[in-house]
């Protein structure tokens, strides 16, 4: 499920992520100011490369390219309409689909709300839910959607404010001007405002959003049909998932009446039909340098995958001692398996010699263009080498960076926080680490003082696994190894640390927080003693890493400026979890020596369940067994397209040229995962729930005629 990756921030997102939300109100245009070079399209750009994909921004749509490829170039009214009909959840995409504020997204995007509104004696995630009337719709605590109102270029203003001579100075100045622009925007408009860095700093845009904070759950199917096939089918196709949920936006305690919403297509999209996906892709690395990709291939991703394997092994060890642990860790296991598949796919793309040759050829050509111009060479020519040197140095101390920390144990993490709170609280606010300034410090203290359950066997296995891995990668003389193991085996050290600590006791943690630096310094709790030793090691490697990453950020911004100066908007920028429109077609593909069809049907759902004897994860909710005869089994269920998506696109609408909703994006196939770095459309596919399948299920399985009629405008 693609959104789960977008929530995991081990992947660098190129957007400036500070967002300011306002509450005042004044009229604001819903227009989009065209980006510089917006008229430049792939057909006229120098050396356009299709491996950069089709995640187009709304201020630079490639109209000439669309006209030539699909015989269709939408006007500004069409673009404004579909932009305003699309809304962003905190971790997903979604869209207005009725004049009464219905919002369509994925089941897994609404999971938090579904869990929160479930009654004590039931769980809507397992049972499903369909509101019989407006009064039955359940308010989702803390959930909101953002509607993109306008886009304004602010590149010149941002660059004018960055005058520093060192990467650290430039980073501070960049953060300051971004914060100022966002605050001014909030104060003058009352909207939620975000300055977005595109082309790695080659271009900056101010995105203004209207936020709707009263959302209510209208309908959600059972998780078993929403994610039918579980991990074995995740990132695969053919699929048979009803991964959908319906929310409703309210305004002043009444259903919202949006001016722009997507009308429903009863027939959906057919084979070969052009479709557009509108959503908020989270993060891609197509503009990364070759050195950055090689670091991820050789260092970053292998370490990440090893960490996932350790975490899964720890859970399995815990389950072997406690049979009830399987249910407790079910979601965590699925998340780890999901992430493992994704990162394995990312790395597969970087191991692929043909893809890397493509990247090398583009970078060589790009650098040659820069070096051919004396002015560009003087400004940007050394940036690639600076990035490569910084990446090399990061690789040299990567093991220390990963192990000189306080995770993944909850007990050790709390000990580390306690030690750090004591140290930082004694400093003036401006001198503290950024994460401990202002109200953040009080929030950390409050979190430490709250009761929380501790799984002791899990903690022992977790610490032992981390120490064992550190022992394998760090030399015996390493200061972390000396203080953490102290001559013991990883298992013996973990046993002593967990058995001897009182960090699981909220009252004990509270006494240390209230006692401050003196209490922490005097404590002989084994985890506090260890955390006191780790803290200076961690500060050193983090400071070194921050310094190198500042060099990388400064130079990748220069590369982004160089890229933009040559290619303009003819190449789409990397994903930034902001609204994009991607073009593609409905199309099957060759797989496993045969051909995958462009669509699946309900016939296939029951065939796949039957082939696995209806055993988990191929079992069906009871209503899907007893009500099978109600369905028209030939109805399309899921389908695939060549659109360009990644994590964050979950819940995106797929629309036709009439701006009608034909599908709901929920995943990509396994071949799609390497598209994170270089896009291809030969076998990678986007997977969507078919609009006809959604209506068929709502009417026949969930007695949801009220809801279906609203969707279909009846």
Regions from the PLM with identified roles:
Residues 2-5, 9-10, 14, 18-714:
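Terminal presequence/propeptide segments associated with secretion/organelle targeting
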